[in-house]
């Protein structure tokens, strides 16, 4: 029997502070819950939306009930007895970090049980010897930044100076990351990518998870805007991924949409589709759901929930994007084939109402739909790897080293 799996990952869509949130300074974080609360209290009204958060399709898959199980509180405005068509769980992260790579890798069988390298100092974040090596190897004449920063704020602060000097802007965050921002036209995209590749080679031995190229356009601080030509240079996964097993054992197709391929350092990816906006990600995903061959795993990362709304602490924008996605989800559900398994999940939290601009350590929703799947609560997962293990079980693959199968089809005991 030919099967397909569709994984829709809403980047940063946590559903409540996890049991170890205190260790990360994230007690009280609740991405879904706090957005729903703001909407319910009319604090997220705009020209595009108003009132309670309206996510009927996500609710039918068990989103609200998943949050209720995780936090003992139903998100405000949600139905305690929705017309449930999906099975649902919530998951605690096993990995030692709350970043994108840790969440994604764990999901596909490679949890991070070691410590990434970090640049913890808020200012003068990068050691002098590293900066000296970068300048020597890349031949750049100077740099700007060298601090923790929001990507949108730092180009406002330093973008004009960058245009004067053409020095790249270096910055980081609480994640294991080295980000480089340059003007796409004045500095050049190819030159940026080449710089990032060289910096990645320098930082890889230090277990810095990613070097990220961030280009922007505009003429001054009032109109600088990041482009969609982001590129992530990631360390290769330390364990075999579900993708590789699928290709080896079933000659499957692994279809990356958005930044999935970059996150997994292109390991086990057979097809790649880029998209520059939430609308484009939805369009490309729907197209692949309609047209991708059987024996495929379609995996989309909806990055804009995180990059445009979570990190920017934009509750209204996040709520509006969720409602847009939910409307598209109806079309995706209607386009599924007889033996498709749909999974919706997240990789961490990024509560737009929380202090700071960093990710938040939260439980994630695990929502599953298949025509023969019993619509019920699947329990608490102790690792995101339960998602990958469930996919392996569904596709008839060798089991992963981590995680348990959550699937319980109708007629099974």
UniProtKB/Swiss-Prot annotation:
Annotated coiled-coil segments of the chain: none
The keyword Metal-binding is annotated on this UniProt entry:
yes
Required co-factor?
A: Mn(2+)
Q: Name one GO molecular function term.
A: magnesium ion binding
Xref: InterPro entries: Alkaline_phosphatase_core_sf (IPR017850), DeoB (IPR010045), Metalloenzyme (IPR006124), Phosphopentomutase_DeoB_cap_sf (IPR024052)
Q: In which pathway does it act?
A: Carbohydrate degradation; 2-deoxy-D-ribose 1-phosphate degradation; D-glyceraldehyde 3-phosphate and acetaldehyde from 2-deoxy-alpha-D-ribose 1-phosphate: step 1/2
CDD domains xref list? PPM (cd16009)
| Residues that bind Mn(2+) 1 | 11, 347-348
Q: Which GO terms describe its cellular component?
A: cytosol
Q: Look at the named UniProt entry and state the broad enzyme category this protein falls under.
A: isomerase
What is the protein's given name? Phosphopentomutase
